[in-house]
């Protein structure tokens, strides 16, 4: 596969590379596949480190003397920071390049977990959440990079495999974190290990075979040359079998200061985000909150409804997480069955999610809880992959970082709303949060039904906003 074109002059040799190395056509497919596998490892380590710490955060902040209300406010601060930072970080990654932005985000996230390992009071704990809340967009940037590397038809499969690799880390992390927390000062040890994992990830990103060629983006994508000008380069690369494009059309313009470029990118994206993409982001918000409500009181609800011990519930959560990881491998075959129509896959997975939330909310049998949780692990995994692919198809690959960043902002809004809605719903019944989630999923389904996108399933007639 050709990820771009060769360099066009000695003046471009000095600039730090922003794309993976590619060689001749016969060897480029192997080289590209290796690069993807390294990115999958980055995703695995990312969630492995995070999932060691996150389940222990509430327990630790309570042990520092915080009241439940203060602990809730501190916990919601992460979502607030993610909300206001994700769009800017996504835009910034489009401007400065994936490598630089990914390295900065990983290193500053490592700093946050290092501070967390030294937090002996609530103030230090809150301070430690700031760099993580602002810069923990490493998975989003990695997904944007993956979308740059592959064609639209291959993108759902590659994103599904990336989510699968990350999911394996999310399965193993809580087990390691739970074991370490039993030791003396176990939380601090876990936080320091998480910091070390992020530093290892930064080393992997630094050592990846990057070079200064364009990615698999349209011909209005921009790359920097050695004289700090930009030139649009058209690539016809695919993941396997495509020859390297030997010619490219070029024009030059002066690069503004980074913050000016970010503001210009935000201005250029404004009409697209709030016209062609409003329904896509609304669907993401509704389905995201629906699933968060399901998980928000899962342990407490099973204990109150079925007298299931938290340890047993933990096994069920690990079981469903493992199934969610396996579901990533099903994305490719399912999309082929649907002729790569991501929209219809998303619609049908959302319908299944809604029905399963209703079953979970109303059942009186623990066996039905296991059944609904099993299928939910598949439907939610497939839905997440398809909504990301739909965003990129409508928004365009030339602003993939910005589009994914806005999507993360929408998810951050969900992280703020879900705990509030869950608290109110739990005042009514332990079944309140998942019941409310089913209602929100139904609204999302109605929006999807009434606002079918005017483009084909393979994205060949992508919406554009001039």
Swiss-Prot record:
One of its GO terms (molecular function) is transmembrane transporter activity. It holds the Pfam family MFS_1. It is found in: Membrane. Keywords: Membrane, Transmembrane, Transmembrane helix, Transport. Gene3D superfamilies: MFS general substrate transporter like domains. It is a multi-pass membrane protein. One of its GO terms (cellular component) is membrane. The chain crosses the membrane at residues 35-55, 64-84, 105-125, 157-177, 187-207, 272-292, 315-335, 351-371, 428-448. InterPro entries: MFS, MFS_dom, MFS_trans_sf, Tet-R_TetA/multi-R_MdtG-like. Belongs to the major facilitator superfamily. This is Major facilitator superfamily domain-containing protein 9. It comes from Mus musculus. The gene is Mfsd9.
């Amino acid at each position: 596969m050709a990820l771009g074109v060769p360099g066009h002059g000695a003046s471009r040799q000095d600039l730090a590379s922003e794309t993976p190395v590619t060689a001749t056509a016969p060897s480029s497919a192997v080289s590209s596949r290796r690069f993807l596998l390294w990115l999958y490892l980055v995703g695995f380590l990312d969630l492995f480190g995070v999932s060691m710490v996150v389940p222990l955060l509430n327990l630790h902040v309570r042990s520092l003397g915080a009241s439940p209300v203060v602990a809730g406010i501190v916990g919601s601060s992460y979502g607030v920071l993610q909300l206001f930072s994700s769009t800017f970080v996504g835009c910034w990654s489009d401007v400065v390049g994936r490598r630089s932005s990914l390295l900065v985000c990983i290193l500053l996230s490592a700093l946050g977990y290092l501070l967390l390992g030294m937090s002996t009071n609530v103030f230090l704990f809150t301070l430690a959440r700031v760099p993580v809340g602002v810069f923990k967009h490493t998975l989003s940037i990695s997904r944007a990079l993956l979308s740059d590397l592959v064609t639209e038809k291959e993108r759902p499969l590659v994103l599904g495999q990336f989510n699968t690799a990350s999911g394996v880390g999310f399965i193993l992390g809580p087990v390691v974190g739970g074991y370490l927390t039993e030791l003396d000062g176990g939380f601090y040890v876990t936080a320091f290990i998480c910091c070390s994992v992020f530093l290892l990830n930064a080393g992997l990103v630094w050592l990846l075979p990057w070079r200064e060629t364009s990615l698999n983006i349209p011909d209005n994508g921009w790359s920097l040359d050695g004289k700090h000008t930009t030139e649009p380069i058209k690539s016809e690369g695919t993941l396997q079998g495509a020859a390297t494009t030997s010619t490219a059309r070029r024009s030059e313009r002066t690069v503004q200061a980074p913050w000016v470029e970010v503001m210009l990118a935000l201005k250029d994206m404004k009409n697209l985000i709030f016209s062609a993409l409003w329904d896509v982001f609304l669907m993401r918000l509704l389905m995201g909150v629906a699933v968060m409500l399901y998980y928000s009181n899962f342990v407490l609800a099973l204990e109150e409804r079925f007298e299931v011990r938290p340890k047993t519930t933990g096994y069920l959560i690990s079981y469903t997480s493992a199934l969610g990881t396996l579901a990533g491998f099903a994305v490719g075959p399912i999309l082929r069955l649907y002729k790569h129509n991501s929209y219809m896959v998303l619609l049908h997975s959302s319908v299944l999610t809604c029905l399963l939330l209703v079953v979970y909310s109303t059942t009186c049998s623990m066996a039905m809880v296991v059944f609904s949780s099993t299928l939910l692990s598949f439907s939610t995994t497939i839905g997440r992959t398809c909504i990301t692919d739909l965003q990129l198809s409508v928004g365009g690959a030339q602003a993939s970082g910005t589009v994914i960043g806005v999507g993360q902002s929408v998810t951050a809004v969900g992280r703020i709303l879900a705990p509030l809605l869950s608290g109110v719903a739990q005042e009514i019944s332990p079944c309140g949060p998942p019941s409310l989630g089913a209602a929100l999923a139904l609204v999302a389904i109605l929006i999807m039904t009434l606002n079918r996108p005017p483009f084909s399933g393979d994205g060949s007639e992508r919406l554009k906003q001039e």
